[in-house]
């Protein structure tokens, strides 16, 4: 079941995001030392409370049998576009369609809020994730290398 994040869910969501993103960090040699701004290391309760209270981001969780097992959020932009943030599924819940449900829910919500496109950022070297987004309607639009990350940022876009 996909539902909106409640305030009391925030600490659990932070742990869920960390647990999900740390698998990517481990696979691609991303550490707190070489990429302190990577989601696995930079996410915090305060940051998610800020997203909820100050930025009013739509935030969603997937819940199965009382367990919060997936998360994502949207950053709505003034140009009619939005950005998908922190799509995460706990490792033990992967390959069950939860990520796809969250992604499709995000597409629907973004469109209902007047967005005409969704932008998505990934670790470009994660070709499995890139292919998954492409299979779910996103188009790869480019890459960018930042000095503060030991990986290349990949960008995808889905017209809504």
Label the predicted regions:
Residues 97-99:
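Conserved G/P- and acidic residue-centered "switch" motifs that form tight phosphate/ATP-binding loops
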Residues 4-10, 15-86, 90-91, 103-105, ...:
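Acetyl-CoA-dependent GNAT
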Residues 87-94, 122-124:
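A short, internal acetyl-CoA/4′-phosphopantetheine-binding micro-motif in the GNAT/acyltransferase core
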Residues 116-130, 134-136, 142-160:
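C-terminal "cap" of GNAT-fold acetyltransferases
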